[in-house]
Amino acid sequence: MFISFEGTEGVGKTTLIRKLYEHFEASGKQVVLTREPGGTPLAEQIRSLLLAVNHDEPMSSDTELLLMYAARAQHLQQVIVPALADEKLVLSDRFTDASYAYQCVGRGLSKDKLNTLNQTFVSHMPDITFWLDAPIELGMSRARERGALDRFEQEKVEFFQRVRQGYQQLHELYPERIKRLDATQAPEIVFQEALEHIQALV
């Protein structure tokens, strides 16, 4: 099974993923914990490029999108596809939905570009996706508490409001796959709700 986790900054994805990872490992399931951009040594190098703050040469939106998909292609081929072939449970912090929300709706890039990249490079889609949703101000406050902000975390509130709208659009388009979780709730409640959705699929 392939599960992805989406949301804007500071909504608690990492906490939920860790809880699910510990739960399924304890039950004897082979679990692969991964993330995007990243997940392989090469993809992690691309992640560093994407998150680095560079005032001398700002990254264009097209470059950002292409780097995301370069990392994604490597991640799929090296981690996700082999793990699924071995019938392991894959938990991925972000996947293709993030590119729609951040690069298409957030940055204003053409959906045709995204569709072409998906058709060309994305061989597998998640069985279920959890969208952790919370007010932007709450998430940004949590992100600031973690310390230095990366290039995305430094974006303005208006950008993240568009990203959140992008996730809402996806949730409405694919309600069977994308499940909204209220990330303002206690982490344990969010975990239990996610677990119920997963168990309903098994």
Curated annotation (Swiss-Prot):
Record-level Gene Ontology MF annotations: ATP binding; dTMP kinase activity
Pfam families: Thymidylate_kin
Positions that bind ATP: G7, T8, E9, G10, V11, G12, K13, T14
Highest taxon listed in the record's lineage: Bacteria
Gene3D superfamilies: P-loop containing nucleotide triphosphate hydrolases
NCBIfam families (UniProt xref): DTMP_kinase
HAMAP family from the UniProt entry: Thymidylate_kinase
Family: Belongs to the thymidylate kinase family.
Official protein name in the record: Thymidylate kinase
Gene: tmk
